Amino acid sequence: MTDLHTDVERYLRYLSVERQLSPITLLNYQRQLEAIIHFASENGLQSWQQCDVTMVRNFAVRSRRKGLGAAGLALRLSALRSFFDWLVSQNELKANPAKGVSAPKAPRHLPKNIDVDDMSRLLDIDINDPLAVRDRAMLEVMYGAGLRLSELVGLDIKHLDLESGEVWVMGKGSKERRLPIGRNAVAWIEHWLDLRDLFGSEDDALFLSKLGKRISARNVQKRFAEWGIKQGLNNHVHPHKLRHSFATHMLESSGDLRGVQELLGHANLSTTQIYTHLDFQHLASVYDAAHPRAKRGK
């Protein structure tokens, strides 16, 4: 085993023992670092001390020429930077040779939104089954508030203020925000809460699976896709498409970009991390005036 391999093995043990990363994450790191080991060996390197920024750039170019996409290259360089940072912390390197090397930005492909008529058709589902009531409530909340999938499945009953028509969500970066959800969503949440105890009452989660546990993201994706087919929509229905539709419809109706951005938990629609700070009353007024389905009761 070369010094290149030895250092990587030490780093992976550190990630496993000290950082307690999951096996899947460890495997991803291992794959990315094996690629740089192979490239470094081909170029005659015996140790990481011989690696410089030129070699890292050449490695990035080679990876792209072999068909690695922009997102994949960004992941690979991120793993490499983290590894070299660790070597610096261990006094094995004086500086991180990958620090100034960045991957080209991956183009953003926003999903096609569902138009208002198709959204009405999607939401007009048969509610004879309690699980259908739950799904209708999830669809209404997802579209009514533009939630991320993780925010939807993470909702607890305590996060609701149905009298005010509001919900608290924990977004990316543990940023909490209060959102209006509209009277349609409130009505369907109340309908679901009347049936929820059929599946279990011990879990704090708002939305439960048929086994009485917090519903999983995969289950939500599956159910939404099934409803899209049942309701005759031409496009595949998935949670992010509802979030995108929320944003599109709100912007078309209001033109208030900053208000919609705040409702989404973004500084802008390209999901940059610069947050604006609008007061909640303004957000509520934007919502009340613009959303095509979920105008709140006063």
Curated annotation (Swiss-Prot):
The keyword Protease does not apply. FtsK may regulate the catalytic switch between XerC and XerD in the heterotetrameric complex during the two steps of the recombination process. GO terms for molecular function: DNA binding; tyrosine-based site-specific recombinase activity. The active site is at residues 148, 172, 240, 243, 266, 275. Residues 109-288 form the Tyr recombinase domain. One of its GO terms (cellular component) is cytoplasm. It is found in: Cytoplasm. Keywords: Cell cycle, Cell division, Chromosome partition, Cytoplasm, DNA integration, DNA recombination, DNA-binding. Residues 2-88 form the Core-binding (CB) domain. It comes from the Bacteria. GO terms for biological process: cell division; chromosome segregation; DNA transposition. Coiled coil: none annotated. Transmembrane segments: none annotated. Site-specific tyrosine recombinase, which acts by catalyzing the cutting and rejoining of the recombining DNA molecules. Binds cooperatively to specific DNA consensus sequences that are separated from XerD binding sites by a short central region, forming the heterotetrameric XerC-XerD complex that recombines DNA substrates. The complex is essential to convert dimers of the bacterial chromosome into monomers to permit their segregation at cell division. It also contributes to the segregational stability of plasmids. In the complex XerC specifically exchanges the top DNA strands. PANTHER family: PHAGE INTEGRASE-RELATED, TYROSINE RECOMBINASE XERC. This is Tyrosine recombinase XerC. It comes from Escherichia coli O6:K15:H31 (strain 536 / UPEC). The gene is xerC.
